[in-house]
Amino acid sequence: MHIVYNRYIHKGAPLMNTALFQQEMKNIEEYAQTLCDTLEENFKQDSIASYKRMAMTDSGYATQRLEEIENGTANLYKFVVQKGRKYLKIINQQYDDMGAYATYQYRDGSVHAFIDRETGDVYKPASWNKPAKHVRYNLLERSDRNFLFDWKNVGWAGGYLYMR
């Protein structure tokens, strides 16, 4: 009796058809953008709290920055999604307005996280090009999404991505 070994190995999740797979990938991309929006809100709220503490010492700079944030004219950090072959890369962008060579536009700062395009797994970055080994969260799990999409739970600096 001849048995094809690979045919009977359990490979985890059952195979899904192409339409369902493409819909899941689209959902993951939307979730990644929502995570970026949440990180931007976290940075905004963190900046407001920081400048309010500074303003207590009668700092004109802090008061000016608070007004810019309230008016929507402040150049706060942005988080953008860059699509790769296997991963979505969430990149922190900073406004370049310092020094003699200032470009006065947003430039890439650092990688905040990697998201697997097929599974929705969220990884801490190991470098600019690759994620760390262990999965931190999964965007397809409702409980993880509820946690990640609350600006009070995530940190713009990535502290929530350390092993828990």
List each model region and its residues.
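C-terminal partner/receptor-binding element of secreted or periplasmic proteins
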Residues: D144-R164
